[in-house]
Amino acid sequence: MDLSKLYQSLNSVLKDKVFYGSNVYDNEDNASMPYIVYQEVTKRPASFSDDTPNYYKVNVQITMVTKKKNRNLEKNLEQVLLNSGFAFSLLSEFKNEDKSLNRVYEITMEEFNNVS
């Protein structure tokens, strides 16, 4: 699993507008739209040897927030993910109270423990 590679890929779509876990620059200012937030949401053992996990499957959620529907930006993000080796699933798309749009993707990565 390489979150730094994922960050670099996402940052190529929206330069300096990619955040881990939240969209907060600091305690006072939030990022202006559009921006991307990504975070690990699950980490489950996928294979065992002698009751010890060999590797984990990690699901990472990627949320792109835009002021309004932006199909070109969506296509760009999806193409960058695919070109970077990240197969994605689109989980949902919904409007926020301020009429902004969240488009939520998920990717699955593997984290190996006992590499021989």
Language-model features, listed with the residues they occupy:
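Short, charged interaction patches at domain edges and termini
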Residues: 1-9, 41-55, 91-116
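Short, compact, well-ordered microdomains
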Residues: 71-104
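Short glycine-rich, basic-tinged beta-strand/loop micro-motifs
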Residues: 54-66
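Broad gene-expression machinery/nucleic-acid interaction feature
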Residues: 33-35, 59-61, 102-104
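Small/polar-rich, solvent-exposed N-terminal microdomains that initiate assembly or binding
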Residues: 1-48, 69
